[in-house]
Regions:
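Solvent-exposed, non-transmembrane regions of membrane-associated and secreted proteins
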Residues: 1-170
């Protein structure tokens, strides 16, 4: 049992390190310098041409405004197959956390009236794990209402209006 727990922890750490490295490498200020956690704004640019060399399915980058509270800053992938990134990393290797991905029936350019983004609710609060705080912390919403989706063409700004727990079997 201890080995299994250690393996899960190691997997979580490897996943986070992969995404942090992608952010350090491909998320930049207009002058080309690396973006720090506090630098993110509408002028922040994702180097999608270079990032797509890592995986051509990367369509966007999702990031919450208040990164001190909500540690969500990930690429959003799209393949048209909702199971592809459920349990695999951006390189196609098995990984329990999978990736953040766009619903297969959506257009990958976020032009639909509703775009559905999936991600796991990890116990260590990675991926979409911090979102459960909307349910359990009354003041959390007031401080964490907004997030941005950065695409190659524009930045979409969204306000959260609801939270819903979905059973894993649904």
């Amino acid at each position: 049992a201890l080995f299994k727990i250690a393996q899960i922890y190691k997997d979580y750490q490897e996943s986070e390190q992969t995404f942090e490295k992608l952010e350090e490498t491909y998320v930049v200020n207009p002058d080309g310098s690396s973006v720090t956690e506090d630098d993110w704004n509408d002028d922040t640019r994702i180097q999608f041409d270079a990032l797509k060399k890592e995986n051509p399915d990367i369509m966007a980058w999702l990031r919450f405004d208040n990164f001190d509270d909500v540690h969500i800053s990930y690429p959003v992938l799209y393949s048209g197959d909702d199971s592809k990134y459920l349990r695999s990393d951006i390189y196609g290797n098995y990984h329990i956390a999978g990736c953040i991905f766009l619903e297969g029936l959506n257009n990958p350019d976020f032009s639909d009236y509703h775009s559905i983004i999936y991600g796991h609710n990890m116990r260590n609060t990675t991926m979409f794990g911090d979102l459960k705080r909307y349910k359990n912390d009354e003041g959390f919403y007031e401080k964490n209402q907004f997030f941005n989706v950065y695409t190659a063409d524009k930045v979409y700004r969204y306000q959260i209006f609801s939270y819903y727990d979905v059973d894993e079997d649904s």
